Amino acid sequence: MRKILILTGRYLPGHKDGGPLRTIINITEALGNDYEFYIVCLDRDHGDTKSYPYIEYERWNIVGKAKVWYVKPGGFSYDLIKKVSSGKDLIYTCGFYESYGYKTLILNQLGKLQGIPVIVAAMGTFSEGALSHKPLKKKLFINVCKVFGLFKKVKWSVTSELELEDVKKNIGENAECIIAEDIPRTSVPGIDFNKIAEGKLHFCPEFALQKIC
């Protein structure tokens, strides 16, 4: 069974990231019987100062059909990314602005990821609306990444032809893109998402991509 590493800001039991979080849940629950999913994310929800209760550090927590490694703020180091990438068949990073994203691109460019294919989820990053927010900072960051060749050895995951055009417009016509439409909403055994949103769910680690691959 192929092993897929997903690097993202937040995962269950978090709920504040909305669409991006829901997408990862749908992928892991829909394809979890065909692939082994390993997710590395922060140990707390967006804007929270406290970590999730009952999680364990420095080990994989079983969450639904995925194994999740929780990281404290500032914990996405180069060494950690290399460590969790070892033995994986594919690395899927949710964007590139965050430290886990650009550090993965740097390691990939330097040949430190053992040749493991890297997929970057565009996640609307290059839409006109997204780029209009802090435009100078974002364009500078994108251009620096391009100058150092950080986008040359990756593939982009997009959800539509329009997003594909946005990527090529900002990265270049040679950007290799894969159109993978969103997977239908799925449920995770033992999790009531309404209770998560209401802050009533007590999380316990024991509850228990085809196009991209």
Where are each of the predicted segments found?
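Carbohydrate-associated surface elements
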Residues: 162, 182-183
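Membrane-proximal helix-turn-helix segments that form the acceptor-binding/catalytic region
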Residues: 138-157
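N-terminal subdomain of nucleotide-sugar transferases
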Residues: 1-55, 60, 86, 152
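Alpha-helix capping/helix-boundary segments
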Residues: 45, 98, 162-164
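Conserved donor-binding/catalytic core segment of Leloir-type glycosyltransferases
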Residues: 3-7, 179-182, 188, 194-213
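Active-site proximal beta-strand in glycosyltransferases
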Residues: 4, 90, 106-128, 155-157
